[in-house]
Amino acid sequence: MLIDRIPQGHKDFVDELLKEHGVEPAGDHARARNDEAPPFWPEEAMEQLRIAFQHPIKMIINALGVPPAEMIQMGRDHGVPVAALAGAKEHALRLAAAGVDIIVAQGGEAGGHCGEVSTLVLIPEVVRALRAEGYDCPVLAAGGIMTGGQMAACMAMGAAGAWTGSVWLATLESETSQIFREKMVDARSRDTVRSKGRTGKYSRQLKSAWTDAWEGPDSPGALPMPMQSLISEPAIHRATKAAEGGNEKARELVTYFVGQGVGLVDNITSAR
């Protein structure tokens, strides 16, 4: 099992961090799901795609690399556009060469896994590079986009539209906890950080005692993906539940993926 490959030092580090914040350690650190094989094993991913295409989806999107050729072909067979995220000009060119229909150029302001190039620079760079190579696939702008004015600005730079994420995280319908939504409202744009402490790859998330600990001098260092998630997800889940129960120290650990646009969030509302 993958959990058996987690060094004891990392398990102890997480246990101590939880205890410091009044949270009972996660025990065996195992996720609720079966961890006998790496997440998103190719056969499993293809089965998920087959199920997805049985439904009336409007678009399917790939992140972290070039979509497999089978995914692109399935999109064509079902008349569903295939999009993919790019954090650099070179990424966009590889995606276009692979036959992707839509490219989401995601700047470093974005929440979750992201690169280092800002949206303001990335959009015109990607648009220019694609046109120079003869590709006419539309580009959607992503990363820090929270308002209509920002969308219009991105379209003025050549984007065909915008791809938004963080703007929805403070809504009542989102998957986030009430504790995290409240922290979003209180946060400034400088209160996010690109950290490996959650997934093992750099991902932008809200600064918290969790991210501080993994970037601190006593950190054992993040494990490679997907190992880090095996210890981070159960721990953060337990901390969130404890915070929801009134544990103020546990609240300090609560975090989630969110972009720098969080500074523009001033209330919790409905997506309707």
Q: Across the structure, where does each feature detected by a protein language model lie?
A:
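Active-site entrance/lid segments in N-terminal catalytic domains of soluble metabolic enzymes
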Residues: 1-133
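Conserved active-site-proximal phosphate/metal-binding subdomains
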Residues: 3-11, 18-19, 116-138, 146-272
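Residue-level detector of alpha-helix initiation sites
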Residues: 66, 145-146
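Short hydrophobic "strand-cap" motifs at the C-terminus of beta-strands
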Residues: 142
